[in-house]
Amino acid sequence: MKILLTLDNPYESDNPYFRELIDNIKKIDSEIEFDWGIKKFWANNSFDIVHIMFPHFLLKIGDKNEEHSLEELELRLQVLKNKNIKIVSTCHNIVPHYKSNIEQIQSYDCVYRYSEHIYHLGDYSRGVFEKKYPNANNLLLEHPVYNDLYTEFPSREKALKKLKLSSKYKYILCIGAFRDDEERKLICKIVKSFKKKKIKILAPLFCKIKFKKNIFSLIKEVFTYLRYKILFKRIVFTGKSVSDTLLSYYMSVSDVSLIQRVKILNSGSLPLNYYFGNVVVGPNVGNVGEILKKTGNPTFDVTDLNSLPVAIRAGFDLFYMGLGSENKKIAEKNWLIKHISDKQISYYKLLKISGRGGVNKYILDKIYSGKINYSFMHSSLLFVKRCA
């Protein structure tokens, strides 16, 4: 089975999501072959499955060598479908965040309309898409925990020493990039609300200097960086990404983690923090809000910043009541990388057997609707493979 992922080389990305899934899927089933690249999407018809990740990447807006129109995208999807190449997509976003180009926004609807499977990282988007795209099979494929990558759980004392932090403070962790000033406002709100408390915020990428050719733009970047350093001393940031080695220490030193997003559907930070036993505070938005509420973690209202300090206080209270330990159990039971990889393999194989005569359509419909659980689905696929 040959599968094309519509993204650039995943082994050159800071985000381990794609390479972790690729490596673990290949360990489980050596018959699955992966390739990637936007150019191959437009030129190559030799794949069994085309798995689309971020639809707007296919247009390459602003790249004169690879730029394509929305009309060209729809024609290409029609060609793939006519050649019986299966089209599937993962719903990382319903529409792209912070994009204003109308064709980039419309590319999402275009791809989802042509997808036979749409994989969802939570039940919120799955519910929305079952109404909006009823002809697709909307399937749950949660964000994995990279338990093969993060194997160390250093003690709080060891983590404090490693990161050169004082034991006098409680720490709130915000990992990941800050995409807009409205996300920085969340952190500044916490600092102002807890100025009399011994609380610091670990936000490595809170502000970074982007080196630009324009000297005035560069001066502005440096000024902004220094301004935050001087005025917000309780925000600990370096402007650099945290290595996989150091990330375990950041996780271990923090009791509460904040997902600093206003516009969001999914978050890789959420399952990872659960795995390390932290309580997670996040926006009551998308799959993130749905998962947090379902598991008893605090949420805040993105339209009311005053709800954020309330959620943070609740987060610390819940940590001391043992919610972090419960979160860890949830992650270990549901989100380990092997479990999610197994699930993805089964979904890929469903594409093959769903079009094959002799397979019970009633069972397939039950699997697609979620009325047959994953374990039964996996056993059914093994049986079909033996009978094929």
Predicted feature locations:
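Short hydrophobic beta-strand element within catalytic cores of glycosyltransferases
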Residues: 259, 279-283
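Short acidic alpha-helix that forms the nucleotide-activated donor recognition element
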Residues: 242-254, 271, 275
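Donor nucleotide-sugar binding/catalytic pocket of nucleotide-sugar-dependent glycosyltransferases
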Residues: 116-130, 134-152
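A charged, aromatic-enriched C-terminal amphipathic alpha-helix characteristic of glycosyltransferases
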Residues: 319-374
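Conserved acidic donor-binding segment of nucleotide-sugar-dependent glycosyltransferases
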Residues: 294-306, 313-320
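Nucleotide-activated donor-binding/catalytic signature segment of Leloir-type glycosyltransferases, i.e.
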Residues: 205-207, 213-249
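Conserved donor-binding/catalytic core segment of Leloir-type glycosyltransferases
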Residues: 166-182, 191, 201-202
